From Swiss-Prot:
Its EC number is 2.7.7.6. Residues 263-335 are annotated as: Alpha C-terminal domain (alpha-CTD). It is an enzyme of class 2 (transferase). The gene is rpoA. It is found in: Plastid, Chloroplast. It catalyses: RNA(n) + a ribonucleoside 5'-triphosphate = RNA(n+1) + diphosphate. Belongs to the RNA polymerase alpha chain family. One of its GO terms (cellular component) is chloroplast. InterPro entries: DNA-dir_RNA_pol_insert, DNA-dir_RNA_pol_RpoA/D/Rpb3, DNA-dir_RpoA, RBP11-like, RNAP_asu_C, RNApol_insert_sf. This is DNA-directed RNA polymerase subunit alpha. Residues 1-231 are annotated as: Alpha N-terminal domain (alpha-NTD). GO terms for molecular function: DNA binding; DNA-directed RNA polymerase activity; protein dimerization activity.
Length: 335
């Protein structure tokens, strides 16, 4: 096996991209290094950057769809191969890039027969589609498909109410996460006194891994800047004051309960097929090499949402089963 060799600075802290690849329009990869770091610094920066990459970068998604021909989400429309639910799921997968602030409107107006793809979406000039070939629907007859869309820029993911809006439109649970995955690793040298931080970033194509790295860094810096203004820590808020009631602090009670339960059971020996999961969820987990309860607990809610065909409802069902049977919770984000 040939060992990889890279050139790093000996004194000045520097970063650089050591590898980049485009698997498709909707999957970009970048590998970066930061060095030289003192012992322990790489892990501190790596953990913070991973959290910022996955949770602090805004993305643009379709969040609502409206059509006069739709009676309910699970209906079928004559002349359209897909069900309404399948069309909504296809719209959820559309990757957008924008300079949008807040929300805006878009639309689809197509006459069949033929395929409806992302390129058929009529967008405002400040929103663009990353992959025009993404499939939306198949029209098998000469009918007209008209859909109004709401587009929103935000971060994280939102769970919208399952009911329709008052205007008859249907919510789409958006995942505003342009970074699909991020990992960090550490290489030690000089007898363990110096470290190199490696950051791997996969994006959905709405921004490059390098752009994601820059934006996550800016957002992380913005979060820390208030700590530099020590003279303003008791600044009067005047009309902007807001009193927040604090709940009882039960962290240690929950931790003790979790530790006690973990000691009573061998997590490796509890297989997920023993936990009342529906076959579809079980198969999704199995395809991601999750076979035991321990495998499942090594993932966060965000990790599950990135699995193919996984939905918000599936995550909620898993959380309910973990709480009911094992008194265990699954974190939203992985530290």
């Amino acid at each position: 096996m040939v060992r990889e060799k890279i050139t790093v600075s000996t004194r000045t802290l520097q970063w650089k991209c050591v590898e980049s690849a485009a698997d498709s329009k909707r999957l970009l990869y970048g590998r970066f290094i930061l060095s030289p770091l003192m012992k322990g610094q790489a892990d501190t920066i790596g953990i913070a950057m991973r959290r910022a990459l996955l949770g602090e970068i805004e993305g643009t998604c379709i969040t609502r769809a409206k059509s006069e021909k739709i009676s309910h989400e699970y209906a079928t429309i004559m002349g359209i191969q897909e069900s309404v639910h399948e069309i909504l799921m296809n719209l959820k997968e559309i990757v957008l890039r924008s300079n949008l602030y807040g929300t805006c409107e878009a639309s689809i107006c197509v006459r069949g027969p033929g395929y409806v793809t992302a390129q058929d979406i009529i967008l405002p000039p400040y929103v663009e589609i990353v992959d025009n070939t993404q499939h939306i629907a198949s029209l098998t007859e000469p009918i007209e498909l008209v859909i109004g869309l709401q587009i929103e820029k935000n971060r994280g993911y939102l769970i919208k109410a399952p009911n329709t809006f008052q205007d008859g439109s249907y919510p789409i649970d958006p995942v505003f996460m342009p970074v699909r995955n991020a990992n960090h690793s550490i290489h030690s040298y000089e007898n363990g006194n110096k470290e190199i931080l490696f950051l791997e970033i996969w994006t959905n194509g709405s921004l490059t891994p390098k752009e994601a790295l820059h934006e996550a860094s800016r957002n992380l810096i913005d979060l820390l800047i208030p700590f530099l203004h020590t003279k303003e820590e008791n600044l009067s808020l005047e009309d902007n004051q807001h009193i927040v009631p604090l709940p009882p602090f039960t962290f240690y009670d929950k931790l003790a309960k979790l530790t006690k339960n973990k000691k009573k059971m061998a997590l490796k020996s509890i297989f997920i097929d023993q936990s009342e999961l529906p076959p579809r969820i079980y198969n999704c987990l199995k395809r991601s090499n999750i076979y035991t309860l321990l495998d499942l607990l090594n993932n966060s809610q965000e990790d599950l949402m990135k699995m193919e065909h996984f939905r918000i409802e599936d995550v909620k069902q898993i959380l309910g089963i973990l709480e009911k049977n094992f008194v265990i919770d699954l974190p939203k984000n992985k530290f």
